[in-house]
Amino acid sequence: MIYWKKRLLCLLFSLTLRRQSKTIYNMKKIILFSAILFWAVFSASAQNKNAQVVTWTTAIQKVEPHNLPPAPYLEGNSLRQIVEVSFGGNMVSLKLSNQYNTEETEIIGVELAKALTQGESAAIDESTTTALTFGGAKGITMKPGEIVVSDPVKFRMTPRMDVAITIHFGKASRTDVSGHPGSRTSSYIAEGNTNDFSKAVETTHWCYINSLIVNAGKKFGSIAVIGNSITDGRGTTTNHQNRWTDNLSKRLLANKKTKNLSVLNLGLGGNCVLRGGLGPTANSRFDRDVINQEGVKYAIVFEGVNDLGGSWNGEETAKQLIESFKTMIKKAHEKGIKIYGATIMPFKGNNYYNESREKGRQQVNEWIRNSGEYDGVIDFDAATRDPQQPDRLNPAFLFENDWLHPNADGYKVMGDCIDLKLFEK
């Protein structure tokens, strides 16, 4: 009897140990699963918190001979360029482009600082000067065609702040430059590797700078605007930042529902959609300048007038433009980007005008307004045309009587006519 009692006790003890062992094993699985789940949530949260969004950018092209940097040129010298950001941030990276160069460009050093005079001078708040690094190094040599991004650095930017980007060059070509001719903002070239710009030479072009990228939260995003000289700001006031995109940016920042959106001006003077024109066509650069920009949530397409202005058959060109716009819309939607079409403004009085080209303009605008292909419409035509003669610009908005580009008042009307609800979705 005692024997069987002992056997029974041993059996019960063994079962208890197995249950405890199984419980411990299950607890380990629960703890491991919880740890994995926590890591995944934390990682996703960190990625959202540190999502990269562009707060300023420009469209890069091969700089034409008449827009190249003046003497003393860039090699061995320092270049200070001023840009105005949309929203601010505390962790910033700079993208530089050597995309159209056939030679190497040597960068000895780069600094960011707060600019003090909106580009009217090279003055900076020296206490804000922050050196950038590239893979931990002070400088970098960009290979032909290369685009590089600096390491993120702590640098406080506030909304609409003017940032001075100072580049110290080693080897740099005089005639082979990637940049943006229509900066509408002053830049300054000083001799030598220096931060003394008191005797600097002033120019109004950007060279090599491409984007300022902010580590921002998931609530932040950007509106990429692809366009021609009317987006680039032909007719605005140098250093006043009064393009229509600037006005839109100010309105967005003042609206609680849209204050976390940057406006990226990717206009190029003389740009075409289909072929010819200045710089890469809108068709060829759409991926680079819109789809692949960090943080893009919305896009605006405002192109076509230069294609029509150089066409032999306005209605045939209109058909080709519409097909190109359909392709852009498809690409944007595949990336989850809402895309809006802007109507082509009138140009009677300019040498672009003839009846065939006007018919083409009306054809494109009719499609933009009524096809339903775009996610929304921005009607610049209606906002800027002469009420008495709708095939020409309102005379109050003329720049130098060219009957193509608006003046500062016209650009303000353009920025004001855009419904901000398009960007509250």
Where are these regions (language model features)?
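N-terminal secretory targeting modules
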Residues: 8, 12-26, 44-226, 236-239, ...
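Sec-dependent N-terminal signal peptides
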Residues: 30-39
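Phosphate-binding active sites in nucleotide-utilizing proteins
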Residues: 240-270, 283-284, 289
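Catalytic His-Asp segment of secreted/periplasmic serine-dependent ester chemistry enzymes
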Residues: 309, 345-425
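Solvent-exposed loop/turn segments at secondary-structure junctions
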Residues: 100, 172, 229-233, 268-273, ...
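Catalytic nucleophile-elbow at a beta strand-turn-alpha helix junction centered on a G-D-S/GDSL motif
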Residues: 220-246, 269-272
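Oxyanion-hole/transition-state-stabilizing segment in secreted/luminal serine hydrolases
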Residues: 236, 268-320
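Structural recognition of the beta-strand scaffold that forms the well-ordered cores
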Residues: 222-227, 231, 261-267, 297-303, ...
